[in-house]
Amino acid sequence: MNRKEIICRGDELFRLIPQRPPMVMIDRFYGIEENTSWSGLAVTPDNLFCRDGVLQETGIIEHIAQSAAARVGYIYMLREEPVPLGFIGSVEKMKIFRLPSAGAELYTGITIVQEVFDITLITAEVKENDELL
């Protein structure tokens, strides 16, 4: 994944995703190139999904979901259309090699595999310092 310049952060992200604090699990959006988008998250000790200073699996899943939502939100924002709500249909073949600690900077790539009507199949890679989590 190539590091990109941040194009959206802070309160600007609320234009892309429906979540609000304390449920916000992205704090940077880097944009879209072809069928891949990038987002980021600074893991903080007070994160809703942190336990004993470690981001739990559910937090990683929610981060991926919001990263995918930010991609869709960005596309709709560029079209000047209302951002739609989305839902996770299922999670399959997910492998987590390690959980990130508070202080970690996550960099996530969302790649579109297939889109049929309003259903989107994605793959995701979440990294910390170029190490796949």
Each model region followed by its residue ranges:
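Catalytic strand-loop segment that frames the active site of acyl-thioester-processing enzymes
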Residues: 21-56
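Hydrophobic beta-strand-centered segment that forms part of the acyl-chain substrate-binding groove
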Residues: 4-7, 70-107
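Short aromatic-glycine motifs in intrinsically disordered, low-complexity regions
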Residues: 10-20
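Conserved positions in beta-strands of structured domains
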Residues: 14, 27-30, 97, 111-113, ...
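Hydrophobic core residues within well-ordered beta-strands of beta-rich domains
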Residues: 23-25, 106, 120
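A conserved, well-ordered hydrophobic junction motif at loop->secondary-structure transitions
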Residues: 42-76
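HotDog/MaoC-like acyl-thioester-processing domains
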Residues: 2-3, 70, 101-104, 111-133
